[in-house]
């Protein structure tokens, strides 16, 4: 069997020569390559199979224009706001997602405020648990950073940041039965779980509105970190329950201070 290509100025043909002289229609085997298949017999008695590429709808996507930017961008161009009060960057960003982001910003700031109050409490001279004060101060700063990250995202998507009221937190965290260290850490664990629940609700809003980018942002920037924080504080609660309110609390405080 011999395979050869024959070229001309207008087209090219691929010939298949079978020296056994078997006549067989192979056109069904090549539906996407050719619509014209010819069988011919030469002087030597050999059969020659040849096909020529022809223009069809199946090859338009390969050889024709599949994307016309100036034509397709026209509808987007018509939607570009002309008012200076409207965002130019906003695209497929629902009002519900925008409102949910603002609510989460408020959650992060409120939790940050509570942690800041706890930092001030444990930093008192008559409490003097500097390790716990350090931990809650860092936690407060972290929640504030989360709020700012959400604010940056809101602006990036073309939304409007609307800060809401922050509730005044408690200033006393003394607990007669548990002790202030354990009570404070249990409160922190509850707050972290609450923040995680709020983030999951925000993710649900993003999924409901088919906002893939927002969903990915929440997953990559918040959810993993939140789960890790819950695990860490859970361990701290378990350790404080084990050591009790006395000398063990002081050692736990030193661990946080030196960590």
Swiss-Prot record:
Enzyme Commission number: 1.16.3.1
Keyword line: Chloroplast, Iron, Iron storage, Metal-binding, Oxidoreductase, Plastid, Transit peptide
Domain (Ferritin-like diiron) ranges: 91-244
Main location: plastid
EC primary class: oxidoreductase
Residues bound to Fe cation 2: 143, 192, 226
Binding positions (Fe cation 1): 108, 143, 146
GO molecular function: ferric iron binding; ferroxidase activity
Keyword Oxidoreductase included in the entry's annotation: yes
GO biological process: flower development; intracellular iron ion homeostasis; iron ion transport; leaf development; photosynthesis; response to iron ion; response to reactive oxygen species
Catalytic activity: 4 Fe(2+) + O2 + 4 H(+) = 4 Fe(3+) + 2 H2O
Classification via PROSITE patterns: FERRITIN_1, FERRITIN_2, FERRITIN_LIKE
GO cellular component terms, A-Z: chloroplast; chloroplast envelope; chloroplast stroma; Golgi apparatus; mitochondrion
Pfam families: Ferritin
Range annotated as the organelle transit peptide: 1-57
InterPro entries: Ferritin (IPR001519), Ferritin-like (IPR012347), Ferritin-like_diiron (IPR009040), Ferritin-like_SF (IPR009078), Ferritin_CS (IPR014034), Ferritin_DPS_dom (IPR008331)
Subcellular location: Plastid, Chloroplast
Sequence segments annotated as region (Extension peptide (EP)): 58-90
Family as reported in the entry's similarity comment: Belongs to the ferritin family.
Subunit structure: Oligomer of 24 subunits. There are two types of subunits: L (light) chain and H (heavy) chain. The major chain can be light or heavy, depending on the species and tissue type. The functional molecule forms a roughly spherical shell with a diameter of 12 nm and contains a central cavity into which the insoluble mineral iron core is deposited.
Function, in words: Stores iron in a soluble, non-toxic, readily available form. Important for iron homeostasis. Has ferroxidase activity. Iron is taken up in the ferrous form and deposited as ferric hydroxides after oxidation.
Stated name of the protein: Ferritin-4, chloroplastic
Organism of this sequence: Arabidopsis thaliana
């Amino acid at each position: 069997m011999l395979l050869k290509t024959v070229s001309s100025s207008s087209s090219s043909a691929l010939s298949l020569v079978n020296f056994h002289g078997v006549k067989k229609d192979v056109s069904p085997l090549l539906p996407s390559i050719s619509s014209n298949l010819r069988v011919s017999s030469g002087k030597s008695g050999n059969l020659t199979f040849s096909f020529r590429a022809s223009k069809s709808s199946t090859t338009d996507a390969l050889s024709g224009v599949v994307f016309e930017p100036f034509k397709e961008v026209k509808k987007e161009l018509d939607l570009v706001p002309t008012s200076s009060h409207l965002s130019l960057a906003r695209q497929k960003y629902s009002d519900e997602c925008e409102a949910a982001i603002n609510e989460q910003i408020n959650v992060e700031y409120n939790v940050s405020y509570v942690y800041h109050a706890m930092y001030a409490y444990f930093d008192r001279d008559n409490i003097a648990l500097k390790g716990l004060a350090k931990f809650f101060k860092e936690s407060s700063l972290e929640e504030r950073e989360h709020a700012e990250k959400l604010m940056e995202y809101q602006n990036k998507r073309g939304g409007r940041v609307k800060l809401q009221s922050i509730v005044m937190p408690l200033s006393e965290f003394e607990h007669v039965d548990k002790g202030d260290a354990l009570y404070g850490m249990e409160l922190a664990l509850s707050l972290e779980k609450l923040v995680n629940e709020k983030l999951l609700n925000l993710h649900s809003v993003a999924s409901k509105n088919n906002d893939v980018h927002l969903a990915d942002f929440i997953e990559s920037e918040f959810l993993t970190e939140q789960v890790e924080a819950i695990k860490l504080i859970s361990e701290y609660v378990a350790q404080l329950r084990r050591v009790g309110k006395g000398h063990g609390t002081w050692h736990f405080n030193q661990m946080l201070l030196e960590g």
